[in-house]
Design a protein with these regions (language model features):
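N-terminal beta1-alpha1-beta2 module of alpha/beta enzyme domains
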Residues: 1-67, 168-170
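Active-site mouth loops of central-metabolism enzymes
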Residues: 8-20, 78-86, 168-177, 259-271
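Hydrophobic faces of well-ordered beta-strands that scaffold small-molecule active sites
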Residues: 4-8, 38-40, 73-75, 103-107, ...
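N-terminal small/glycine-rich loop or linker at the start of catalytic domains
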Residues: 1-15, 70, 112-117, 151-169, ...
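Internal, glycine-rich beta/alpha segment that forms the wall or movable "lid"
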Residues: 2, 50, 84-188, 203-216, ...
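A structural motif
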Residues: 35, 100, 189-190, 285-286
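Short, acidic/polar
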Residues: 17-30, 91, 174-184, 269-279
Length: 311
């Protein structure tokens, strides 16, 4: 059965200021309405002209954890090569402890070269660095003592406690589009997380992930899939089309090398949104992260009360 998460607005448009009290209220209401999970976006820097304000994802989820009790907390997705993996293991492991075992770790290799330059990480080596960092992080979470020397990292009987609440560790979803990423998702991740994919594109990508899992000697049935979709519940598709297209084309990116597209958008009357989402549910996707139009509280209410009960 498909579960439904909700994206949080820790990332805002140019010239805006993140509304922290509003974010807390949004998270508390999402939990009360029965959403399965909340997902924070991740960048260190994003954009020059314009630039996009973004609150750190791990910090934001930690604050939300203190104000909620049961809703799961996901990074959608953390740019792992930008983080020191030992420090990331500590911060993320602590988040799992603080939240009582609610972390879902979505990770990706990243795409914004300026961000890598600013942090001092070689952009063209991000795939290799991603795999190295993920290996170090998972070792620290799952092994009693870690002894490993790789690149600049020299772990000598490193012990990371307290242990994560989830055993053997929190679930790790690999985000991205190209075959190298899909292979990582199938071979070393617990599943795949993608963004703005139509049902057809999602099915194509997920079949590849499962094939890569089988090649690695893994059972694809142990993996989970997640797709992120923008949703606008209005009176009709005609009424919602222009506003949705403008929002997606001015505040969101779709990678040219992927099949992500603003044409994925779920919009229209409640009945029309239900019909469009049913096409995604039929793909067998395990989780859909909904991005409500402009994160409006009334959209969250309408999605929870008029759309989800009919799926």
């Amino acid at each position: 059965m498909t579960s439904y998460g909700l994206a949080v607005r820790n990332f805002v448009g140019p010239g805006e200021v993140p509304d922290i009290p509003g974010l807390y209220a949004y998270a508390e209401r999402a939990e009360a309405l029965g959403f399965e999970s909340l997902w924070a976006w991740d960048h260190v820097l994003l954009g020059v002209e314009p630039s996009f304000p973004i609150v750190d994802s791990i910090t934001m989820l930690g604050a939300i954890a203190a104000r909620t009790r049961t809703i799961k907390l996901g990074t959608g997705v953390l740019v792992l090569p930008l983080r020191n993996p030992v420090v990331a293991a500590k911060a993320l492991g602590s988040l799992d402890v603080i939240s009582g075992g609610r972390l879902i770790l979505g990770v990706a290799a990243g795409w914004y070269a300026r961000e890598f330059d600013a942090v001092g990480i070689p952009f063209k080596q991000r795939g290799k660095i991603f795999e190295r960092n993920l290996d170090i992080l998972t070792r620290l979470w799952t092994q009693e003592r870690v002894t490993l020397k790789v690149d600049e990292f020299n772990l000598r009987e490193a012990v990371m406690v307290p242990r994560t609440v989830q055993k053997p560790r929190p679930p790790i979803l690999v985000g991205g589009y190209v075959d190298a990423v899909l292979k990582r998702a199938g071979a070393i991740g617990d599943g795949w997380l993608t963004y703005f994919y139509t049902p057809e594109s999602f099915t194509k990508g997920w079949e590849k992930v499962k094939a890569f899992a089988r090649e690695a000697g893994r059972d694809p049935r142990t993996l989970t899939s997640t797709n992120q979709l923008a949703v606008y519940v209005g009176s009709s598709r005609a009424q919602t089309a222009e506003d949705m297209r403008h929002w997606l084309s001015t505040e969101w990116d779709t990678a040219a090398w992927s099949e992500s597209t603003i044409e994925h958008a779920i919009h229209g009357s409640a009945e029309e949104c239900v019909a469009q989402l049913k096409a995604h549910v039929k793909t067998g996707v395990d989780r859909i992260i909904l991005i409500p139009y402009r994160y409006q509280p009334e959209q969250v209410e309408r999605i929870a009360k008029e759309v989800l009960p009919r799926l």
